[in-house]
Swiss-Prot record:
Gene this protein is translated from: dadA3
Similarity comment: family membership: Belongs to the DadA oxidoreductase family.
Binding site for FAD: 4-18
Organism annotation: Mesorhizobium japonicum (strain LMG 29417 / CECT 9101 / MAFF 303099)
This protein's name: D-amino acid dehydrogenase 3
Protein EC: 1.4.99.-
MF term (GO), any: D-amino-acid dehydrogenase activity
The protein's role, per its UniProt record: Oxidative deamination of D-amino acids.
Cofactor(s) named in the record: FAD
Gene Ontology CC entries for this record: cytoplasm; plasma membrane
Amino acid sequence: MPKIVVIGAGIAGVSTAYALLEQGYDVTVVERRRYAAMETSFANGGQLSASNAEVWNHWSTVLKGIKWMLRRDAPLLMNPTPSWHKYSWLLEFVSNISRYRENTIETTRLAIAARKHLFEIADREGIDFDHVRRGILHVYWDKDGFDHALKVNEMLNEGGLDRRSVTPSEFAGIEPALHGKFYGGFYTPSDSTGDIHKYCAGLEKACTKRGAQFIYDAAVTRIERRDRFNIVCATDGADQTLVADGIVVCAGTNSRDIAAMFGDRINIYPVKGYSITVELDGAAADSSAPWVSILDDRAKIVTSRLGAARLRVAGTAEFNGVNFDIREDRIRPLVDWTRMMFPKVATEHVVPWAGLRPMMPNMMPRVGKSRVPGVFYNTGHGHLGWTLSAATSAMLATVVATDLPIDARLAA
């Protein structure tokens, strides 16, 4: 059977490996970190959120970015230091504003399809990932924010999502722990949350049982094409060369550099997000911390309940290149917001984290073929990697099956 090497063991890479195994391929996954899901997929917001499918390509996003440029605690922060990569990405971002509606609807449809795939995989493989299926509540503080959400809701509905408007008086019935003087909100009962790292680890085990090999601490440094691909990886000690019939690039923010080895331009920019994981204490946590996931549109902050003992709070977007620094002035707003929205939640024990979202300028993942035969991409999912990966991986596996059919290789 054809041998496929998947580069990257985050949510996109592990999901791709699983989809290819389902097709019958011999799969090896190469990851530069020591374990699966140690970068973008380690401690993100935890939402499986079709309701968050609105792409960012809108003039309001541009205006907010300019307005907030001098605020170190702003939800959207842009480092003004000149960078050709950053500015070229921003120009492409603006050029895709005309596709805002079309891409939002398509993302919604993709997210709904992905949900079905992911739930089926988790059930089939018995993956425990602190899954909570209580929906997502979007909250808005003023009329302008709510009116924009009404327009977004039309697109989400056209994409097939049931997201209904709710009044502040209805909030208590949805999530009693929530505090605030809101204008209105939208509730999506079909959305859910969970621990993406636990899901990836469980899916990695499922892939291993199905015959996949995972090679860690192995950074791809060179790829050569002879009769087959020779993939050279730097490991502890001597370099290791893998031979493959096909390659799938799922390398997150590193995908841009890998793509350049094939002469492809994948204009991914690393957009940093932050999170805190609040360690909940005692039986009172059940009533003080939310079980329903919250998305505060003004603050750009989300919550996910990860079992009885943890609450994930995440958000913000920072354009600052490849930078994993955890800044106190970016973590502090998450802690302050948690105290404001859930005053009975103790925040003495929080674990901060920062990760880089692999963002394409059009906010759509790159799924499909390279200009080089036998090379494929499933990358650039941005802030919706977990929400979309199960569907894009199934799509990619179908493309691979067309280009590298198993029967043809066996016949050869």
